[in-house]
């Protein structure tokens, strides 16, 4: 049975709604540091909303579901969590999931029920659209996931067809790397983002000396793969995958081989757990995140400071904490409009879905944005980070290690594909 944690929706300094309770949930891998820090953002948003009186007189009850099994995300666990929410009529929507492979499994069961899903972190483009050439075509299709039902899925982050190319451009042009070895973890996310990286890197004139893949269940030693990259002349390594698939352990093993070249990846490695996995070889790790860094967004300073006061733990703030905060607020705003549609009563899931689809000009901490008909955000920003030593982790713009607490992902740059 998947773990569920219920939060009694109060926050100091105000009175919650008195008309009753509306539930929202989340489906995240809270067994991981990244998953828990994302859940923190949702709880913070709900606490703030209830402290201000709730949503049109209703208290919002937030329940966090864990989709981990054996220390990693599980699509099967995610499906069970969504089924639990669907079975309780008080749930009107959810934040999540965290991983694209989980979304692929959840959309087909949530869509017929008009159940709103808003992901703070899914980046595989095929969840919402077809990928144009020269990138590899989708192996599954957004329309098939919805099976003729109205769209019920949105995300506040941009997609890997931007994220992969962003790191390819940064490695080629800024780090002056012209040959790389590419490794992916065989997941929906890992295969997709590494393929997008490949295409862009080659288009710039770079060489992918080898592209290898592995599966977590059967792999604990990457040295043979890494030696293949090294001997083929790779000047850097790009990895497509996530920390819970052990994608950052190869970085540690590079040190064992005496091979010191930059190690880049997507948002799946911009995590505390990745820094821990690199274990003594943290410097030289680069990562992208599929959105603006909230600490760099004008007007977000007060919200970030308030969050850190409420959640003061060293690893409570993560790469997608503020995206989750935005997603929760977008959902609660749609619920509020749906309450109006229901003449002040509890709305149906379809009323909430219809209002979510009308979201325009949403003002969040990561920017002001719309959603298109597919559920994608109008923001097309990719942030780039590097692991560096910092004097005060609390002032870091990224996430930090646990054991190596002063080694953090530090914001370096961003690419805005909406304006380029």
Which residues does each PLM region occupy?
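Short, low-complexity disordered leader/linker segments with a strong preference
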Residues: 1-23, 51, 411-420
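Extracytoplasmic "Venus flytrap"
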Residues: 18-21, 25-43, 65-75, 98-99, ...
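Solvent-exposed loop/turn segments at secondary-structure junctions
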Residues: 29-33, 67-71, 99-104, 122-127, ...
């Amino acid at each position: 049975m998947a773990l569920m944690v219920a939060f009694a929706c109060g926050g100091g300094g105000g009175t919650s709604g008195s008309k009753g309770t509306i539930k929202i949930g989340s489906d995240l891998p809270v067994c991981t540091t990244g998953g828990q820090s994302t859940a923190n953002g949702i709880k913070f948003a709900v606490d703030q909303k209830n402290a201000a009186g709730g949503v049109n007189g209703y208290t919002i009850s937030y329940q966090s579901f864990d989709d981990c099994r054996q220390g990693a995300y599980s699509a099967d666990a995610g499906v069970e969590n969504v089924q639990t929410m669907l079975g309780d009529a008080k749930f009107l929507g959810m934040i999540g999931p965290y991983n694209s492979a989980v979304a692929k499994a959840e959309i087909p069961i949530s869509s017929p029920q008009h159940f709103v899903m808003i992901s703070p972190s899914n980046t595989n483009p095929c969840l919402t659209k077809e990928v144009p050439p020269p990138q590899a075509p989708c192996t599954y299709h957004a329309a098939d996931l919805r099976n003729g039902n109205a769209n019920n899925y949105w995300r506040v982050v941009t997609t890997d067809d931007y994220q992969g190319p962003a790191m390819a451009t940064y490695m080629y042009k800024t780090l002056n790397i012209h040959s790389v070895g590419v490794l992916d973890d065989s997941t929906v996310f890992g295969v997709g983002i590494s393929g997008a990286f490949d295409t862009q890197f080659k288009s710039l004139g770079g060489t992918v000396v080898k592209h290898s893949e592995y599966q977590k269940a059967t792999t604990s030693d990457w040295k043979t793969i890494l030696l293949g990259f090294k001997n083929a002349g790779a000047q850097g390594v790009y990895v497509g995958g996530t920390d819970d698939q052990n994608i950052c352990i190869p970085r540690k093993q590079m040190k064992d081989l005496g091979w010191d070249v930059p190690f880049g990846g997507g948002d799946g490695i911009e995590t505390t757990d990745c820094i821990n996995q690199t274990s003594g070889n943290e410097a030289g790790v680069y990562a992208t995140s599929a959105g603006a860094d909230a600490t760099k967004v004008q007007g977000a300073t007060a919200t970030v400071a308030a969050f850190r006061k409420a959640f003061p733990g060293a690893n409570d703030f993560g790469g997608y904490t503020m995206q989750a905060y935005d997603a929760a607020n977008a959902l609660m705003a749609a619920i509020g409009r749906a309450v109006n549609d229901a003449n002040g009563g509890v709305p149906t899931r379809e009323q909430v879905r219809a209002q979510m689809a009308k979201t325009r000009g949403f003002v969040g901490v990561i920017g002001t944005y719309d959603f298109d008909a597919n559920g994608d955000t109008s923001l097309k920003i990719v942030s780039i980070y590097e692991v560096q030593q910092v004097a005060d982790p609390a002032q870091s713009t990224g996430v930090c290690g646990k054991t190596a607490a002063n080694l953090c992902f530090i914001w370096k740059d961003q690419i805005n594909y909406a304006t380029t």
